[in-house]
Amino acid sequence: MTDISSNPEGEVLLLDKPLTWTSFDVVRKVKNTLRIAKIGHAGTLDPLATGLLILCTGKKTKQIDQIQAQEKEYTGTFRLGQTTPSFDLETAVDAERPYVHLTPAEIEAAATRFVGVIEQTPPLFSAVKIAGQRAYELARKGATDTVIKSKTVEIKTFELTRIALPEVDFRVVCSKGTYIRSLARDLGTALSCGAHLTGLVRTRIGEFRLADALTLDAVQALAPPRPATDDAARRPRRERQQKPPAPRAGLEFYAAQQASAAPVTSAADAPATTN
């Protein structure tokens, strides 16, 4: 790849977004690493999703709207029988309902109801603007009566690739603006058991595929060398103090859950209990 920072035409970069990183985290990292003046992303991914994030630099930023409008493909996992306010693992379970009576045929039949052009209501924990504020800002302040307008989206494919209750793995091909977290909620409602999203990977945007994406480590390897100066050669370089990463608002519960789920060894090796 050519020196991205000096390419006047710009680049379309495919990135594999890490778990818990925001889309802006990735943009900032790439901007600083490659020293790019103009850069933006073509479609947000939630912090708890991973996969394809497209970044455009220089003149290629004019293509952002065109790329955003293309269909998306996702794979992931729903957890039946439990709901959360955010429809994913960002918040604690707020309700549990029976699910063991459901058959694969019933779950498949419910999924088919969401294929095609549908009306979908975005999650309260989303970037949708309400009276000038992001919905997630209102949600984190405890607002529960916020009304979010539904919008028209298209689910082109909703394939259930594995059913191992309470988990259901899926593949979805959908239009711009579709919330997979909302699809989890709606499927759970259709099954009268509730559901939330426990894992999500974006595998494709139009013809751009995750298989062709760079990791952030690969981006680091593309960093242009810093120009040496006489002053820099004479002066010893000061070691920068490593700052602890800033806490990401909204992921405190997820981080605590992951910490508590860390394996603990014991002499007894007692089996874990289930709810």
Each language-model region and where it sits:
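Catalytic/RNA-binding core of pseudouridine synthases
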Residues: M1-N275
